A protein has these predicted regions:
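PLP-dependent enzyme catalytic core of the Aspartate aminotransferase-like
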Residues: 119-121, 252, 309, 316, ...
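Glycine-rich phosphate/pyrophosphate-binding loop
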Residues: 29, 38-58, 65, 333-358
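Short, well-ordered beta-strand elements within core beta-sheets of diverse protein domains
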Residues: 242-251, 298-306, 361-365
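A common structural junction motif
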Residues: 230-231, 318-328, 379-386
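Conserved N-terminal alpha-helix of the aminotransferase class I/II PLP-enzyme fold
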Residues: 34-83, 87-88, 104-111
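Conserved PLP-enzyme active-site core in the AAT-like
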Residues: 2-3, 13, 73-272, 277
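Conserved small-domain helix->loop->beta segment predominantly found in fold-type I
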Residues: 261-319, 323-325, 345-351
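N-terminal "arm"/small-domain region of PLP-dependent enzymes with the aminotransferase-like
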Residues: 1-53, 59-62
């Protein structure tokens, strides 16, 4: 049972809180690969750190508590978490994915799981009526991001979960962009939640990790087996870093999102900006749905400049904001999805779903917002062609 109903408190005290033996307020780092056994069949509950480690177990209990699941699982990366979840499916199964998802998710489905007989199809998950008609006997799951990467498309998670339950299939939600502080998909009917914990949960661009949570005991047993069998687990030190990062998630996201809301309004009013993608703007696609299922619009913004602006010059001129892969750290980061995060998606598919060569994705940090805006403004001014 959780110590509190409030997530702000759960972030700090949820899961396994400290060390009961020594009284240490932080979970110790059990930097060990194996555990001494008193005799044959006589262990302390720990045998080998791929199978289980006390530091990792504390993290797994914490994310289960935060998402409202029965079990959590920690992996060496977000893609390790996603791949282990996808390993639940078998030859002949098909998974419906959102029309814009992280390029790594597309790549592992297209280049790895397709070769193993697990196929996928891309659908507009915002159109529930049409989505319902796309479920054929071979479809076994929906895999959704909301807001989606990189266009921040919002999907009605409860609506999709209802369709999934009607057809007896699973709903898997990548909750990386929102985290359980802003959105809890299991409460909306999802069966499995995955995270690239590298992002907001870690929050400091110093750890690569992935998490999965389920509220279904049968799925939890299968995931536990596959986690151990596949072996892409998170080490104890990285587990400790993630626990530490999660403690400040609430205060960080409060600043992230406060900054993002102001920057989105600034970009929306800028004469050089053609389009702003941000779920927190009243005219955004899915604004009302996002308001219903999430605390706010999050801290990711994508935008496009009008013709006559050279985005290469924009990126080059930035001083405070770093051009880099990833997102969700305390520092502001910007990227070019077409050639970076979504480069593995064929150009014709990218263009069809709206990921243009002119799209810019901004991960809003927690710096003074005025400084971020000044840097964006300098970049836009430098990008204007004579």
């Amino acid at each position: 049972m959780s110590i509190s109903k409030y997530i702000e408190t759960k972030l700090i005290h949820g899961g396994i809180d400290g060390d009961k033996v020594t009284g240490a307020v932080n979970v110790p780092i059990y930097q060990t690969s194996t555990y001494k056994q008193a005799g044959l069949g006589e262990n302390t509950g720990w045998e080998y750190s791929r199978t289980g480690n006390p530091t990792r177990a504390a993290l797994e209990a914490l994310i289960a508590d935060l998402e409202g699941g029965v079990a959590g699982f920690a992996f060496g990366s977000g893609m390790a978490a996603t791949s282990t979840v996808l390993s639940l499916f078998k030859l002949g199964d098909r998974i419906i994915i959102s029309s814009n998802v992280y390029g790594g998710t597309f790549r592992v489905l297209d280049k790895v799981f397709k070769n193993l007989g697990v196929t996928y199809s891309i659908e507009d998950t915002t159109d529930l009526a049409t989505l319902d008609t796309k479920v054929t006997p071979d479809v076994k799951a929906f895999f959704i991001e909301s807001p989606a990467n990189p266009l921040l498309t919002v999907t009605d998670l409860a609506g999709v979960a209802a369709i999934a339950k009607k057809h007896g299939i699973l709903t898997i939600v990548d909750n990386t962009f929102m985290t359980p502080y802003l959105q809890r998909p299991l409460e909306l009917g999802a069966d499995i939640v995955v995270h690239s914990a590298t992002k907001y949960l870690g929050g400091h661009s110093d750890v690569v990790a992935g998490l999965a949570v389920t509220n279904n005991k049968e799925i939890a047993e299968k995931l536990a087996f596959n986690q151990n069998a596949v072996g892409a687990v998170l080490g104890p030190f990285d587990s400790f870093l993630l626990i530490r990062g999660i403690k400040t998630l609430g205060v960080r996201l409060d600043r992230h999102t406060e900054n993002a809301e102001r920057i989105a309004r600034y970009l929306e009013q800028h004469e050089a900006v053609k389009h702003v993608y941000y779920p927190g703007l009243p005219n955004a696609q899915g604004y009302e749905i996002n308001k219903k299922q999430a605390k706010n619009g999050g801290a990711m913004i994508s935008f496009e400049l009008y013709e006559g602006y050279d985005i290469k010059k924009f990126f080059k001129a930035l001083q405070l904001i770093s051009l880099a892969e990833s997102l969700g750290g305390v520092e502001s980061l910007v990227c070019h999805p077409a050639t970076m995060t979504h480069a593995s998606i064929p150009k014709e598919i990218r263009e069809k779903v709206g990921i243009t060569d002119g799209l810019i994705r901004l991960s809003v940090g927690i710096e003074k917002v005025d400084d971020i805006i000044l840097d964006l403004n300098a970049g836009i001014n430098a990008a204007k062609e004579a």
